[in-house]
Amino acid sequence: MKQLFTQHIKRLQQVVQTILETNFLSGLWIHSGTARYHFLDDQTAPFKINPHFNYLFPFPTAENCWLFLDGKNKPTVYFYAPNDYWHTPPVAPTDAFFADEFQWVILQDSQEIAKFIQNPTACTFIGEDENLAESLGFNQINPQKVLNQFHFERSIKSEFEIEAIYQAQFAALKGHQAAKQAFFEGKSEFEINLAYLKASQQSDLNVPYGNIVAINQHSAILHYTQLDYAPNPQQQSFLIDAGATIHGYASDITRTYAADPNSEFAAMIKQMEQYKYRIIDQLTVGVNYLSYHTQMQQWIAEMLYEYDFVRLTPEQIFEEGISRAFLPHGLGHLLGLQVHDAAGFQQNPRGTRKSPPEVYPSLRCTRDLAENMVLTIEPGFYFIDMLLNPLQNSPLARHINWQKIAEFKQFGGIRTEDNIVMRSQGAENLTQKAEIELQLSDH
């Protein structure tokens, strides 16, 4: 990772230099952030690092630390390492693979930073605590023009970032295997989640997002995180959407299982997986992501016809918008330091935004695919009452096999998700690559 990070930070030094020159600035100060206190409480929420800090300094537990960059000299990290007997004192990672790329200053008192900030009016501040920035004399605080430039750069990953996301696949896949086993042993959602955390060596505090561990109808809730503590004696299906992080970079993987491998629902899961691999094989640099989402909607229309849920032609099902009730979310999203990573709608460094079309409001990416973009591909098929009820009260209702839909509501839904990186010749499936290395893939 050391060599890859050296290339990564060299590229970012050039990016920072361009940002400073185009915005007539002499330097960039980035604050990593601090844990927020709960309202009227002395307890804090878990610390979540400023992603722009993590972008340059891959150490996601670096709380209340600072970076200074001028685009020319070696960046300086001001690492906050107070003496403390209430909490485990932070230890500066001065022997980490990335350490040699920085000048180091250790702060034992957070107020010490003030003496290092020279001429703040000629610099910009990036961070959450705008009151802190004002108190230190900054007047250019999170300028949108600077953020736009950073966000656009973050959408095209360096080889260091791609490797981190690839490494994050392994912990997640080990967790998925343990969760699958726990489901087939009849465990509760709560117990399945514990199995995932143990196998992936994570806690609920450092997973990249709340694990979705959904049995039966719970799979129809797209972001179900409640967890039943008691086992369900009538387990029919299981959907798990869970990831891991390496150096702050996330994996985001989803799998669905049928309790009865010979059921029609199991066949539907297999077909959805085939659709996922088929669309991944089609991904091409320069083609807009919307076209692939539209293709998936057309395939969902075919499934609705083939499995006799809707008694219209696939073309009619798609044109009438019926498929959108069964796949209400987008095909996927950019992935990186944030699970839904920056600049999914941003078309250029200036910040030009292209919103999703009205018929697909949940689409999270409207970009043309570019080399070294990392994205999720996550088609789904669900039985969601909130979306089916309007159809039941529409003229299209007579074409829909409500009896069969009622029978399948017990399964909740299907989602299958892999993480891919765009290469010049097409998509490289990072999840499948890790599955093969772990000897988990049968594709």
From Swiss-Prot:
Co-factor note (free text): Binds 2 manganese ions per subunit.
GO MF term set: aminopeptidase activity; metal ion binding; metalloexopeptidase activity; phosphoric triester hydrolase activity; proline dipeptidase activity
Catalytic activity: Xaa-L-Pro dipeptide + H2O = an L-alpha-amino acid + L-proline
EC numbers on record: 3.4.13.9
GO CC entries: cytosol
Keywords from the named record: Dipeptidase, Hydrolase, Manganese, Metal-binding, Metalloprotease, Protease
InterPro entries linked to this entry: Creatin/AminoP/Spt16_N, Creatinase/aminopeptidase-like, PepQ_N, Pept_M24, Peptidase_M24B_aminopep-P_CS, X-Pro_dipept-like, X_Pro_dipept
Gene Ontology terms describing biological process: proteolysis
Top enzyme category: hydrolase
SUPFAM superfamilies reported for this sequence: Creatinase/aminopeptidase
Cofactor(s) essential for the protein: Mn(2+)
Residues the entry annotates as binding Mn(2+) 1: D252, H333, E378, E417
Chain residues that bind Mn(2+) 2: D241, D252, E417
Presence of the UniProt keyword Protease in the record: yes
Secretion signal span: none
Function: Splits dipeptides with a prolyl residue in the C-terminal position.
Entry similarity comment: Belongs to the peptidase M24B family. Bacterial-type prolidase subfamily.
Record's protein name: Xaa-Pro dipeptidase
Primary gene name: pepQ
